[in-house]
Design a protein with these regions (language model features):
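Structural motif
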Residues: 4-6, 32, 61, 123-125, ...
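Conserved beta-alpha-beta core of the PfkB/ribokinase-like small-molecule kinase fold
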Residues: 32, 37-111, 133
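Conserved N-terminal subdomain of the carbohydrate kinase-like
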Residues: 1-37, 58, 206
């Protein structure tokens, strides 16, 4: 059915990422950085990620793409990440998990998103709902787009391509609604291709 599943092993190299002068120098130059929860399962990498985020410029987009995998996350990791982020990317299944974890399972989707946006003073919250569309919540505004109907070959890379093209569009000065549209269209195209990193047609980039 084209839907991915993962078996993630422990003790990987990315569990032990050191914080180096080179990494600190890179952080100070960033216009955007995307981070998730999985690489934070080990304290070494988690501390490096937090130090990297703390070293970024004030106007850097710090995107927490929550990306819950197996049991490699905790409430504390999610809260600490949200404190450092100014953008959150989450899908509808993850939102249910977070709703239970944070103690508001009975709220509807939109109210959960508005609550998280306000509580953690985020600039944006991006919610993807598979075939049921996607939302971008920002302070005082919401963008909703339906998911294009396509012949799905492989969903691996769909979320990352959405996030990457959305963030690149925002950095290039596109309004949020237009950046959202580009993200949706690129993600839909990636779903029609085998593999996570197909060549993106130029027509989809603008």
């Amino acid at each position: 059915d084209g839907v991915a599943s993962y078996d993630i092993k422990e003790g990987s190299a990315w569990d032990n990422i050191p914080f180096t002068p080179e990494i600190e120098a890179l952080a100070k130059q960033c216009r955007a950085v995307c981070f998730g929860s999985l690489a934070q399962r080990n304290k070494v990498s988690r501390d490096t990620i937090y130090r990297f985020l703390d070293a970024t410029p004030k106007d850097c987009m710090r995107i927490f793409d929550i990306n819950l995998r197996q049991n490699f996350y905790s409430k504390e990791i999610i809260q600490e990440s949200l404190k450092r982020a100014n953008v959150m990317k989450i899908n509808d299944e993850e939102l249910v998990t977070i709703g239970r974890m944070f103690g508001y399972p009975g709220m509807d989707v939109e109210n959960k998103c508005w609550l998280i946006l306000g509580k953690y003073n985020l600039d944006m919250l991006v919610l993807t709902c598979g075939v049921n569309g996607s939302y971008v919540f920002s302070k005082g505004a919401m963008s909703y787009l339906e998911t294009p109907k396509v012949e799905v070959a492989d969903t691996v890379g769909a979320g990352d391509s959405f996030t990457g093209s959305f963030v690149a569009s925002v950095l290039n000065g596109k309004p949020i609604a237009e950046a959202h549209r580009i993200g949706v269209n690129v993600s839909a195209y990636v779903c029609t291709q085998n593999g996570a990193m197909p060549v993106i047609p130029e027509a989809l980039k603008s």
